[in-house]
Each structure stands twice: as structure tokens, then as C-alpha cells.
């Protein structure tokens, strides 16, 4: 697992340095055990840029655009937590054993309690349609996709090449339905993202300013 920060240069030119293993074609995954230093291979990086049609000529966003540069576990934890918060109303009302058990496989009891308690305090009244019902199967990758969709909606429209690189850092999953965030709501959406950064990655919040 990639537990180092990714540089802007690596994000642009070195997909092998950050690509989630699940994103690789199956044939490539079968070859990697024979290439122990594959993430550092210039030839493989060039091949991956071509394989995923990754354009290297794009303008890197700032502020919330620091997201794909974070260590893997922190990146996934942040987006998963944001995804859970976006289902906070449904979690608060949840009384069935099965979904509660599924939630407790993602977070511990104290974190789940925190999500419930802080639901109405994070940004005040929630805008219409920002909160969603819980899916039947509550999985980390599903919540990560929810968090990702909202995070992107909170930003100005970003270069497709940058968005694609961010998605390649994450486990394979069905993309979430887009979050509809009006331009006038973006400051509030960004505030929510920044608050989650401070909760999950308190020592790194300056990177997102």
C-alpha cells in the first residue's frame, strides 16, 4: 500500500506510483510479481499513460485539489468518512441490526456515534438532496465513491485528466450518482470537505488551503 505522499510530478507523469492495484488490467496484475520495482519503472509509467489515455497537459487545481496527493490509507479514509457523513440522516434513523453491523465494519462505535451526534452541527441545515438513503450493501468502496462524487461537486469543474487520475487511486467500484451542488452552494460544500479533513487528517489540513 502506498503510504507516502504523491508529488504533483508523479501524479502527472508516473501513474505506476499511485495506481490502485484493482485498476490494473488482469493481465498486468499477473505480471507484476515478476517486477518488484514496477512502481518505479519509467517504461511501465509510459505504458500506463498510454493504456489509460492519460493526458499530461492539464492545469492542476489547488485547495481541495490536494486530495489525490495524500497517502493511500488517508485518501480512502477521508472519502469513506465523507461518504458516511452524506448518509448521516439515514444512519441517525437506522434501527435495523444488519445495516448497523455493516456500518460497524467500516468505523468503530465511537466514530459512528460521532457521525450521528455531529450530523446537524457540521454545516447547519443540510441543503435539499445532499443527504441520501443508505444502500442495501454498505461497503467501504461505495462510501468512497459517494465521498468522491461530492468532493468533485464541491470544486469548480476540473480537468478530466486530473479527475481520471484521482479515480485511478481508488478501489474499483460503481461510480456514485453525481451530487447536485449549485454554484452558490459550493462554498458550503467546500466547508464540509475542509471540516472532514480536519477531523480525519488534522495535521494535514494546511495542505488543502
UniProtKB/Swiss-Prot annotation:
Induction: At 37 degrees Celsius in the absence of calcium.
Role noted for this protein: Belongs to an operon involved in the translocation of Yop proteins across the bacterial membranes or in the specific control of this function.
Keywords, alphabetical: Plasmid, Virulence
Name the UniProt record assigns to this protein: Yop proteins translocation protein K
Organism: Yersinia enterocolitica
Amino acid at each position: 500500500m502506498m503510504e507516502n505522499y504523491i508529488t504533483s510530478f508523479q501524479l502527472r507523469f508516473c501513474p505506476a506510483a499511485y495506481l490502485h492495484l484493482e485498476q490494473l488490467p488482469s493481465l498486468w496484475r499477473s505480471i507484476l510479481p515478476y517486477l518488484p520495482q514496477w512502481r518505479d519503472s519509467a517504461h511501465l509509467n509510459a505504458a500506463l499513460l498510454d493504456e489509460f489515455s492519460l493526458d499530461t497537459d492539464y492545469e492542476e487545481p489547488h485547495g481541495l485539489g490536494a486530495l489525490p496527493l495524500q497517502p493511500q490509507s488517508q485518501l480512502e479514509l477521508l472519502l469513506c468518512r465523507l461518504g458516511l457523513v452524506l448518509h448521516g440522516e439515514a444512519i441517525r434513523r437506522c434501527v435495523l441490526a444488519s445495516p448497523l453491523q455493516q456500518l460497524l465494519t467500516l468505523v468503530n462505535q465511537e466514530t459512528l456515534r460521532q457521525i450521528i451526534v455531529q450530523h446537524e452541527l457540521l454545516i447547519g441545515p443540510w441543503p435539499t438532496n445532499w443527504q441520501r438513503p443508505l444502500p442495501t450493501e454498505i461497503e467501504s468502496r461505495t462510501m468512497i465513491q459517494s465521498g468522491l462524487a461530492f468532493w468533485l461537486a464541491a470544486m469548480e469543474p476540473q480537468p478530466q485528466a486530473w479527475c481520471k487520475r484521482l479515480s485511478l487511486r481508488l478501489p474499483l467500484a460503481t461510480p456514485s450518482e453525481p451530487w447536485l451542488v449549485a454554484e452558490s452552494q459550493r462554498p458550503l460544500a467546500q466547508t464540509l470537505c475542509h471540516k472532514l479533513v480536519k477531523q480525519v487528517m488534522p495535521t494535514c489540513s494546511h495542505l488543502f488551503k
